[in-house]
Structures are given as C-alpha cells and as structure tokens.
Design a protein with these regions (language model features):
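Hydrophobic transmembrane alpha-helices and immediately adjacent juxtamembrane helices
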Residues: 1-270
Length: 270
C-alpha cells in the first residue's frame, strides 16, 4: 500500500515552505502547459472572453435587447457576466480534471490530487483575472469612461466565484470517480449552469415565477451583486451574498472530505 513520504526531521514551517514551493512550481507548469506558454495562455483567455463579449454585445444591440440590461455601459454589463461565469466554469473543469486524472503523479512523495486542484485552479484565476481587467481597461479606453462604482468589490466577488467553481469541480470529480452516470450528469449540469447563471440577464426584471429557476445557482447571485457594485443606477433586489458564501463553503468542505476519502480508499486498494 502506498504511503505518503514523511520526513521525521521536518518542522511545521519547513512543511509550509515546501508546500508553497510545490504549489508555485505546479502552478507555473500549468500556466505554461495550458497553451504552450504563459503569454499564450493569457492571450487565449483574453481572446475567448473578448469573442463571447463581442458576440453577445452585437446580439443584444441588433436584437433590441439592451433594455434587458441595466442603465450604464452595456459592455461592462456583459464583461462582468462573461468573466465571472467563465472563471467559475474553467476552474470547475480544472478541479475536475485534477481530481480524476492526477492520481499517477500524486503517487510521488509530497504530491496529492488536491495539490493539483489548487495549482490548476490558481492558473485559471491568474489568466481570467488579468483577462477581465484588460477587457475592462480596453473598454474604458475606447469609450472614454471607466464605469465601476465600487471597484473594491471586484476582487472578493471574483475570488468567491472562483472558489465556488473549485468546490463544485472537486465534488463532480468525486462523482465521476465512482459513478458511471456522472459523465451524463456533468454534461446536463454544465448546460443548466450556462442558462441559469444570469450573465446576460438583469436579475431585477426576471418574473417571480421564473426566479426559482435562477436563484439556486450561486453564480446568478455573484454576477448580479457585482453588477450592483459596478453600476450606480442598479441595486440588486433578487440576489444576496449570503447564499453563495454558504454554498461555496459547503462545496469546499465536502470536496476536501471526499478527496480524503478517495485518497484513503485508493491507498487501501493499492
């Protein structure tokens, strides 16, 4: 049976330092390996987010759907929705791939699947955080105004959406490790997340009968709350921050518990 390597002479701070170094090394490796280099990975994230923003900007403009947005910069409205959703989705997929595909590498001393979850997730955070900031600054240069009422709220809300995606990915990774039907569930779940995230919808204008279809999704709350922080003329009425915080906490705790169970179960089998 495989047992993790233990150094009897190691101290707590040595362990923290070694863990941080491993995290940094794996994160750099993920950033470079994703698209052949750190710069290419960043450009890929910017390009994908920009493409979606432009497509839906023209759709909403030419289809006369701008009234569904808030009073303010339509592109900022779309950038917030696209950026937050894709950051959470790509983090979820990264954590999922780490939970299901890193067990061979995790058999080496000091490594574990959760370390790969962290490194892959941090790589996604790095790419999409910078991508959103660049898109925002580029839009401000074109329009001549940088509309963001409470910029201090951007980082905590973006981090919360990132953590939510990581916890959901760990939970899905456990399901796909043990259940054959989890692959189909993941596909359906991703489609439902795409529809109910509210990235192109003003949450305040959704009819009450349709609200339950959206409010279960923590990303719906986070995107709407960020728009409330961004636009001076918009106040969220149908969303809050308590729900996504609770869901994110439960997903992260359950994800780490299930990871520990998977690790122990695999060690017993091997």
């Amino acid at each position: 049976m495989y047992k993790p390597y233990e150094n009897p002479h190691a101290t707590f701070w040595n362990g923290v330092r070694n863990y941080a170094f491993l995290m940094w090394a794996l994160t750099v490796r993920e950033i470079r390996a994703a698209s052949g280099g750190a710069a290419l990975g960043l450009l890929k994230g910017i390009g994908m987010a920009l493409a979606f923003c432009l497509v839906f900007y023209f759709i909403m403009t030419f289809a006369g759907l701008t009234g569904l947005a808030v009073r303010g910069d339509l592109m900022i409205f779309i950038i917030i929705g696209i950026g937050f959703f894709f950051a959470a989705k790509m983090t979820m997929m990264a954590a999922l791939s780490a939970m299901t595909g890193s067990w061979d590498m995790a058999s080496h001393p000091h490594l574990s699947p959760v370390l790969f979850v962290y490194s892959k997730s941090i790589a996604v955070f790095y790419n999409y955080f910078i991508a959103i900031v660049i898109l925002y600054l580029g839009n401000g240069m074109i329009n001549g105004s940088y509309e963001l009422q409470s910029p201090i709220m951007f980082f905590p809300l973006f981090t919360l959406s990132w953590l939510c995606g990581m916890g959901a990915g760990m939970f899905l990774g456990f399901m796909m490790f043990y259940f054959s039907w989890a692959q189909l569930f993941k596909r359906v779940f991703m489609r439902v997340l795409f529809i109910t995230s509210g990235k192109f919808t003003n949450a305040n204008v959704i009819p009450n009968d349709a609200l339950p279809f959206f409010t279960w999704n923590p990303m719906f709350h986070l995107i709407d709350q960020m728009r409330g922080a961004a636009f001076i003329n918009y106040t969220p009425h149908n969303t809050n921050l308590v729900y996504p915080i609770i869901v994110t906490f439960l997903l992260l705790v359950s994800g780490h518990i299930l990871h520990d169970y998977m690790l122990r179960h695999r060690n017993v089998m091997t």
